[in-house]
Amino acid sequence: MSDLWIESVPNISEGRNRTIIDAIVDAARGFDDSAVLSAEPDADYNRTVITIAGSPDSVLEATISLIGKAAELIDMRQHEGAHPRMGAVDVCPFVPLSEGSHEACMRSVNSVLAEFGDTLPIYLYGDAATSEGRRSLAKLRRGEFEGLRDRLNEGDWADEETRMPDRWSGAWGEREQRFGAMAVGVRPVLVAYNINVNETEPVAS
């Protein structure tokens, strides 16, 4: 058992079809030294946030398995939801949990890049970003899935620094049309919460 602990938090673009969600989450189960801690679907966002934690090698294996299953089951051409997204696995951060585990997270990012980078457009963000201007997930995700085809085929794009993936085959095809693109990175622990406000006026909310 490794003394290093990390987690990955893949966000998948499916929050309504329980059969698909369960199949994707199950793909991350059954690996020694890691566990799925939570899977939190949101029907309005049509998105599920999944947390996998354990030893670096095991978390990586589980994450790669999950991404592969999501690529198989999610078709972004059928997706709609309230949350910004650009792919079937929209974002997959690796998070260091123990002292010295940051480097293990960086290695995990490189392994995901090696596994999927020849078939899926992958953007690196956060601590794994290849330039300061690419650290922000929001900047990389601008235009979302619907704008991806034009973005990657020399269409209008406001910021050339963020236009292209860090790795990709370079040819827009059926797999890209189904999956979209994915952001992978390293970030600290993030605490997020949502509040429901009983108010119809956005300004008042």
List each model region and its residues.
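Long, contiguous binding/interaction regions
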Residues: 2-205
